[in-house]
Design a protein with these regions (language model features):
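Short, low-complexity disordered leader/linker segments with a strong preference
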Residues: 1-44
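Extracytoplasmic ligand-binding site segments that recognize negatively charged/polar headgroups
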Residues: 47-54, 73-77, 89-228
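A ligand-binding cleft/hinge motif common to bilobed small-molecule-binding domains
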Residues: 100-104, 225, 230-248
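Periplasmic-binding protein-like
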Residues: 168-176, 202-207, 213-214, 246-269, 284-317
Length: 320
């Protein structure tokens, strides 16, 4: 077990145990018109954590004429791919994933810095001081239960992280591998810090119940939805809520705390269309309209933490 998680202790980050919901205000102040976009062309290739961002990228295309191609990939996969590509990235923009992977990419010299005036409005802890990455939101983590399978197996619903170590869940828990998933890397960090000296004992007990460590962040959602496993440790966002509605699943917000992790945005060094990618970062963060659109797509309000001055978004803290 310790071998699985040992590499996760290289970076120590503090993650609060709380969760953010999403709500937009009815009254919004339109943005001031932005400066004319620079002369851009071609296609911007994006690696993202999901395939739901089409409307946002369509808006960028409408403003700039730059077409966008998007590939879904976890942050750990992106980092491994970057290193394998040896300084010649196949994509231009990195959109989403745990911020620890972005920090590692910066240290490895794989990112291109981006600076723009509106960055001053972002919280210092949610951006790199040299502009190598910015946070676009916050991901929270909870549990996803297959109601039919839980009933069939006679399982009681877990309410806390400690509950997951109960022997009744042996062989019925799925979790994305923290060595690949930036979000679950953050979960490990947060729980180790919260539990102190008992942290490794906790993960030894949890490991006894986990039947499968997925390679993708979406594996818990997919495998719980299909009935392969009863319990998934998963990020919680709009796609999870939709899956819960469509597949008779229950989302559980752990009573003993919900780890959360900032999600990154960055431009790859030596990217083929680096100008378009750098402008996209400025385009996104310089416009409250674009950030509100992103919040609506993700059904998250965490951008309010990152950019407190944004109007039209109300931060909601979930406890159940």
């Amino acid at each position: 077990m310790k071998k699985l998680f040992s590499l996760l202790l290289c970076v120590v980050m503090v993650f609060s145990l709380v969760a953010c919901g999403s709500k937009t205000d009815d009254t919004q102040t339109p943005d001031e018109p932005q400066d004319t976009a620079p002369e851009l062309s071609g296609t911007m290739k994006v690696v993202a954590t999901g395939d739901v961002y089409g409307p946002l990228f369509d808006a960028f295309t409408a403003d700039t004429g730059v077409e966008v191609e998007c590939l879904s990939m976890s942050s750990g996969e992106v980092l491994s791919k970057l290193r394998a590509e040896g300084g010649t990235p196949s994509a231009d923009l990195w959109f989403g994933g745990g911020i620890d992977a972005f920090m590692s990419a910066k240290d490895d010299g794989l990112l291109e810095p981006v600076t723009f005036d509106a960055a001053a409005e972002l919280g210092d802890e949610y951006k790199d001081t040299e502009g190598y990455w910015y946070s676009k939101g916050i991901t929270i983590v909870g549990f996803l239960l297959n109601n039919s399978l839980m009933e069939e197996l006679g399982l009681t619903a877990p309410e806390s992280w400690d509950d997951l170590t109960d022997s009744q869940y042996e062989g019925e828990i799925v979790m994305s591998n923290p060595a690949v998933s930036g979000t679950n890397y953050a979960v490990v960090n947060a729980l180790l810090q919260a539990k102190g000296d008992q942290g490794w004992d906790y993960f030894d007990a949890l490991n006894n119940n986990i039947a499968y460590y997925g390679k993708r962040g979406s594996d818990p959602k997919n495998k719980v939805s299909s009935g392969e496993f009863a319990v998934g440790i998963s990020y919680i966002d709009a796609s999870i809520e939709q899956a819960a509605e469509e597949n008779d699943l229950t989302i559980v917000y752990p009573s003993d705390g919900m780890p959360w992790v900032p999600e990154g945005v960055a431009v790859f060094k030596n990217a083929e269309n680096v100008d378009a990618a750098k402008y996209f970062v400025e385009w996104l963060f310089s416009s409250d309209d674009h950030l509100r659109q992103l919040a609506e797509i993700e059904q998250k309000s965490g951008i309010k933490v990152i950019k407190p001055s944004i109007e039209g978004i109300e931060l909601i803290l979930r406890s159940s």
